[in-house]
């Protein structure tokens, strides 16, 4: 194999690796966004539960809308 052919093979491997890595990162970003959204909803449900109880709402006024 000549140097030119070896260089072309090297560039093809680099290109293939870059494409696979890029698409994997995008899929991972989508999974992270979905997990983050689910966590945000769970936190919101917990805060609403706290705000429904007077004792907890009094302690966490900044979360329950009892601003200063």
Curated annotation (Swiss-Prot):
<dbReference type="Pfam" id="PF07365">
    <property type="entry name" value="Toxin_8"/>
</dbReference>
<feature type="signal peptide">
    <location>
        <begin position="1"/>
        <end position="21"/>
    </location>
</feature>
<keyword id="KW-0872">Ion channel impairing toxin</keyword>
<keyword id="KW-0732">Signal</keyword>
<dbReference type="GO" id="GO:0030550">
    <property type="term" value="F:acetylcholine receptor inhibitor activity"/>
</dbReference>
<dbReference type="GO" id="GO:0090729">
    <property type="term" value="F:toxin activity"/>
</dbReference>
<keyword id="KW-0008">Acetylcholine receptor inhibiting toxin</keyword>
<comment type="function">
    <text>Alpha-conotoxins act on postsynaptic membranes, they bind to the nicotinic acetylcholine receptors (nAChR) and thus inhibit them. This toxin potently and selectively blocks rat alpha-3-beta-2/CHRNA3-CHRNB2 nAChRs (IC(50)=9.8-22.95 nM). Also shows a moderate block on rat alpha-6/alpha-3-beta-2-beta-3 (CHRNA6/CHRNA3-CHRNB2-CHRNB3) nAChRs (IC(50)=84.4 nM), and a weak activity on rat alpha-6/alpha-3-beta-4 (CHRNA6/CHRNA3-CHRNB4) nAChRs (IC(50)~6 uM). The block of alpha-3-beta-2/CHRNA3-CHRNB2 nAChRs is rapidly reversible.</text>
</comment>
<comment type="similarity">
    <text>Belongs to the conotoxin A superfamily.</text>
</comment>
<feature type="region of interest" description="Ser-Xaa-Pro motif, crucial for potent interaction with nAChR">
    <location>
        <begin position="52"/>
        <end position="54"/>
    </location>
</feature>
<feature type="modified residue" description="Cysteine amide">
    <location>
        <position position="64"/>
    </location>
</feature>
<keyword id="KW-0528">Neurotoxin</keyword>
<dbReference type="GO" id="GO:0005576">
    <property type="term" value="C:extracellular region"/>
</dbReference>
<dbReference type="GO" id="GO:0035792">
    <property type="term" value="C:host cell postsynaptic membrane"/>
</dbReference>
<keyword id="KW-0027">Amidation</keyword>
<keyword id="KW-0800">Toxin</keyword>
<dbReference type="GO" id="GO:0099106">
    <property type="term" value="F:ion channel regulator activity"/>
</dbReference>
<protein>
    <recommendedName>
        <fullName>Alpha-conotoxin Lt1a</fullName>
    </recommendedName>
</protein>
<feature type="propeptide">
    <location>
        <begin position="66"/>
        <end position="68"/>
    </location>
</feature>
<keyword id="KW-1015">Disulfide bond</keyword>
<keyword id="KW-0964">Secreted</keyword>
<feature type="disulfide bond">
    <location>
        <begin position="50"/>
        <end position="56"/>
    </location>
</feature>
<feature type="propeptide">
    <location>
        <begin position="22"/>
        <end position="48"/>
    </location>
</feature>
<feature type="disulfide bond">
    <location>
        <begin position="51"/>
        <end position="64"/>
    </location>
</feature>
<dbReference type="InterPro" id="IPR009958">
    <property type="entry name" value="Conotoxin_a-typ"/>
</dbReference>
<keyword id="KW-0629">Postsynaptic neurotoxin</keyword>
<feature type="region of interest" description="Lacks the Ser-Xaa-Pro motif that is crucial for potent interaction with nAChR">
    <location>
        <begin position="52"/>
        <end position="54"/>
    </location>
</feature>
């Amino acid at each position: 194999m000549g140097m030119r052919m070896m260089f072309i093979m090297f560039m093809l491997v680099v290109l293939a690796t870059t494409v696979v890595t890029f698409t994997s990162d995008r899929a991972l970003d989508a999974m992270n966004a979905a997990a983050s959204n689910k966590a945000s909803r769970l936190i919101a449900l917990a805060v609403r539960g706290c705000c429904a109880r007077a004792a907890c709402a009094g302690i966490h006024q900044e979360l329950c809308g009892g601003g200063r």
